[in-house]
């Protein structure tokens, strides 16, 4: 698990990253800049329980690809979920809050992930445990904002102009961020590579 000091603002950006691409980098960097985060932990997951693992590359390969895509002092690629045998994001959040009680964690996700967030194991536990930053992705804006999770959490949504305050907000709290977008997707890249 990466080190963290009390008072730090750390974004948690989990995904299969199969493969990672510029769209992921834009989500992470938009959140980091707009929220004033000290670090973004790129949590390379052993596998998304809601996705087919048939074409999932080995975790070491995906972790190396994230390191190559997101070098620099603010990006921290990690596969600690695999080492701790964690399957669900809610368990990741619970572990991090126990290990680092003074750290201000923020869950980061692309808008495309928000559309299915209500299908995640214990999603409401995640939403009430830490603030959430949702970064716009092409083709997601209108459909995502009418999805289950944004409707259930609508009264806890911060205006985009208050994004920098999100890491210190008591959950549930979330913000929808707009910024540069990329049409690249992992599915498209796998298709182009014949996977």
Regions found by a protein language model. Name each.
Residues 1-195:
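Nucleotidyltransferase catalytic core that binds NTPs
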């Amino acid at each position: 698990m990466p080190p963290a000091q009390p008072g730090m603002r750390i974004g948690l950006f989990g995904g299969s990253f199969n493969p990672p691409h510029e769209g992921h980098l834009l989500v992470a960097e938009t959140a980091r800049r707009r929220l004033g985060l000290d670090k973004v932990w790129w949590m390379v997951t052993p596998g998304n329980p809601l996705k087919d693992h048939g074409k999932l590359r080995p975790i070491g390969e995906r972790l190396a690809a994230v390191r190559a895509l997101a070098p620099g002092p603010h990006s921290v690629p990690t596969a600690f979920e695999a080492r701790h045998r964690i399957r669900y994001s809610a368990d990741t959040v619970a572990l991090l809050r126990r290990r680092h009680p003074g750290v201000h964690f923020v869950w980061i996700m692309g808008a495309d992930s928000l559309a299915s967030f209500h299908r995640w194991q214990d999603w409401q536990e995640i939403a009430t445990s830490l603030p959430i930053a949702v970064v716009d992705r092409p083709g997601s804006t209108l459909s995502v904002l009418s999805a289950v999770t944004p409707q259930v959490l609508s009264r806890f949504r911060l205006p985009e102009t208050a994004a920098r305050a999100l890491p210190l907000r008591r959950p549930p709290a979330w913000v929808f961020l707009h910024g540069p977008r990329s049409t690249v997707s992992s599915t498209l890249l796998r298709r182009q590579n014949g996977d």
